[in-house]
């Protein structure tokens, strides 16, 4: 039942993506990006709603052409989450989505074109209070930086980012955040570390093109975890070649593991061995599936035997430890109920939901009293 994180976050300027604060003292937000065809309004709206149900704070949508910009406007009218428009090359697309109510523009000033075009986009953003994300990627560095460094390096990523930052500074625009992404964990981490001490704007963290569900989760957890543990990062996106909903789940799991943000159940479970008194793996799989809808922060321990079971169970809001002839459930650190293996998951789910309801009511009462 640990709730406080020892991490001291890097001070940063606060900006607003719609109603979601990013930077400053705001919670670290979790975002994803749609992988539907933006022209398909129905499919894109459906995916955004699934992301919202999974807990996404912000969603990015690719807007490759003017037809997609018009579709973006229709999408924006049908969803509640703040939307970031991902735009490259054509500044007129940025101007159009600004008119249609976009919450944030993801651009690189360097690929928008002439100074007057960049100024037009910045003026549109300034007039409407729209923040900009400068998104630098190792796979699309400027040609002169590729020539200078020979290959993508942390220094090249940061030089590119600072070039864009200076561009916005010249236009007296400070309402922006920055990312310096690479698919290599060490490169991305080094770039963010270099950049963190040179600007005061919020940092959007990500390991780009991290891979599939398993490999991408591991890379993102390692890379983002290193930075977050150092206090670097104000919003995160886990990039996976998978259902975008999985990105949200992994993002929250990373934050939960560092006690930076709590949402839903934090499971503690043993890997199981021959000492287990019930099927730990099956129990865990069923509980994770059944309890996905719970948003109340709750620690749940599922331990198969008495070696570590009582100790772990006592530290959780709800803890199950295997035993003979019966398993023992702890609630808030105290023995509460014995359960046999028959209907074990059903009974455990009932107890967890009851505890979640009690905790939600208690938390609401604290908010009202304060």
Curated annotation (Swiss-Prot):
Question: Its family?
Answer: Belongs to the IspG family.
Q: Which residues cross the membrane?
A: none
User: Its annotated pathway?
Assistant: Isoprenoid biosynthesis; isopentenyl diphosphate biosynthesis via DXP pathway; isopentenyl diphosphate from 1-deoxy-D-xylulose 5-phosphate: step 5/6
Q: What does the record note about the cofactor?
A: Binds 1 [4Fe-4S] cluster.
Q: What is this protein called?
A: 4-hydroxy-3-methylbut-2-en-1-yl diphosphate synthase (flavodoxin)
One GO BP annotation of this record: isopentenyl diphosphate biosynthetic process, methylerythritol 4-phosphate pathway
* Region forming the signal peptide: none
Q: Which cofactor does it need?
A: [4Fe-4S] cluster
- Function summary: Converts 2C-methyl-D-erythritol 2,4-cyclodiphosphate (ME-2,4cPP) into 1-hydroxy-2-methyl-2-(E)-butenyl 4-diphosphate.
Q: Which UniProt keywords apply?
A: 4Fe-4S, Iron, Iron-sulfur, Isoprene biosynthesis, Metal-binding, Oxidoreductase
This protein's superkingdom?
Bacteria
Q: What class of enzyme is it?
A: oxidoreductase
- Any keyword Oxidoreductase? yes
Task: Give the molecular function GO annotations.
Answer: 4 iron, 4 sulfur cluster binding; 4-hydroxy-3-methylbut-2-en-1-yl diphosphate synthase activity (ferredoxin); 4-hydroxy-3-methylbut-2-enyl-diphosphate synthase activity (flavodoxin); iron ion binding
One Pfam assignment: GcpE
Q: Does the keyword Oxidoreductase apply?
A: yes
Q: Which InterPro entries match?
A: Dihydropteroate_synth-like_sf, IspG_bac, IspG_bac-typ, NO2/SO3_Rdtase_4Fe4S_sf
Reactions mediated catalytically:
(2E)-4-hydroxy-3-methylbut-2-enyl diphosphate + oxidized [flavodoxin] + H2O + 2 H(+) = 2-C-methyl-D-erythritol 2,4-cyclic diphosphate + reduced [flavodoxin]
Question: Which organism does this sequence originate in?
Answer: Azotobacter vinelandii (strain DJ / ATCC BAA-1303)
EC number, UniProt record: 1.17.7.3
Positions that bind [4Fe-4S] cluster = 270, 273, 305, 312
């Amino acid at each position: 039942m640990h709730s406080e994180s020892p991490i001291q976050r890097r001070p940063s300027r606060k900006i607003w993506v719609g109603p979601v604060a990013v930077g400053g003292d705001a919670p670290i937000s979790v975002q994803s990006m749609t992988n539907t065809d933006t022209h398909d309004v129905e499919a894109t709206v459906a995916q955004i709603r699934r992301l919202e149900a999974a807990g996404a704070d912000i969603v990015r949508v690719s807007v490759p052409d003017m037809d997609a910009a018009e579709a973006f406007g229709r999408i924006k009218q049908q969803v509640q989450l703040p939307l970031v428009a991902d735009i490259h090359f054509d500044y007129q697309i940025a101007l159009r989505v600004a008119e249609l109510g976009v919450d944030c523009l993801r651009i690189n000033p360097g690929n928008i074109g002439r100074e007057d075009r960049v100024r037009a986009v910045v003026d549109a953003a300034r007039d409407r209070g729209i923040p900009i994300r400068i998104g630098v990627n190792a796979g699309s560095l400027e040609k002169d930086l590729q020539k200078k460094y020979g290959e993508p390096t942390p220094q090249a990523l940061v030089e590119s980012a600072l070039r864009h930052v200076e561009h916005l500074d010249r236009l007296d625009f400070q309402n922006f955040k920055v990312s310096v992404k690479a698919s290599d964990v060490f490169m991305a981490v080094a770039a963010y570390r270099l950049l963190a001490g040179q600007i005061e704007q919020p940092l959007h963290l990500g390991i780009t093109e991290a891979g599939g569900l398993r490999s991408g989760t591991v890379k993102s957890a390692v890379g983002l975890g290193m930075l977050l543990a150092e206090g670097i990062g104000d919003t995160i996106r886990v990039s996976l070649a998978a259902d975008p909903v999985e990105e949200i789940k992994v993002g929250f799991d990373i934050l939960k593991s560092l006690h930076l943000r709590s949402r839903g159940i934090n499971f503690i479970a043993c890997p199981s061995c021959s000492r287990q008194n019930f099927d730990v793996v099956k129990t865990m799989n069923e509980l994770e599936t059944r309890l996905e809808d719970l948003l109340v922060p709750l620690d749940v321990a599922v331990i198969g035997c008495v070696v570590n079971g009582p100790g772990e169970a006592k530290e959780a809001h709800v803890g199950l430890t295997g035993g003979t002839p019966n398993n023992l459930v702890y609630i808030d650190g105290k023995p509460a109920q014995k359960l046999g293996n028959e209907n074990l998951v059903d009974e455990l789910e009932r107890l967890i939901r009851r505890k979640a309801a009690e905790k939600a009511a208690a938390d609401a009462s604290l908010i009202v009293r304060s």
